[in-house]
Structure formats: structure tokens, C-alpha cells
Swiss-Prot record:
This is Uncharacterized protein U6. The gene is U6. It comes from Human herpesvirus 6B (strain Z29) (HHV-6 variant B). It comes from the Viruses.
């Protein structure tokens, strides 16, 4: 799992919860804008296969990039 705090300036909070066969990834954060503060939450469920984890990491980082 990449260091998300280093990847985006908003310093997201990452919570990993193990379940049977899956990992739930909840990322919440906020960032300043010209009109105030923008809050966001991204929630992903990832299967235990390494290829699924890599795909989810790419989706997550792309999602953060689109929020910046």
C-alpha cells in the first residue's frame, strides 16, 4: 500500500479493516479551496488477490488526484 499521506497534500486518514477475504479501505480528508473547505470520503472494498489490491491502489490514487 503506498503512503497516501505522501501522495496527496490533504493528509488523508486511512482506516483498514480486515474481513473474511476482503479489506475495506476508508479514506476521509479535507482540503482548503477558494470558497472554504472541501471534504471527501472514498470507500473501497478490495479482495485478497494482489492484482486486485494493485488495481484498487491505482483507483484510489486517481480519485485523490481528481479531488485536488
Amino acid at each position: 500500500m503506498p503512503n497516501l499521506a505522501a501522495a496527496v497534500p490533504c493528509r488523508p486518514f486511512v482506516n483498514l479493516a480486515q474481513e473474511t477475504g476482503t479489506t475495506n479501505l476508508l479514506v476521509a480528508g479535507s482540503r482548503p479551496t477558494n470558497t472554504g473547505v472541501r471534504n471527501f470520503v472514498i470507500n473501497l472494498t478490495v479482495s485478497e488477490s494482489s492484482s486486485s489490491r494493485r488495481t484498487a491502489n491505482r483507483i484510489l490514487l486517481r480519485s485523490f488526484t481528481s479531488l485536488l
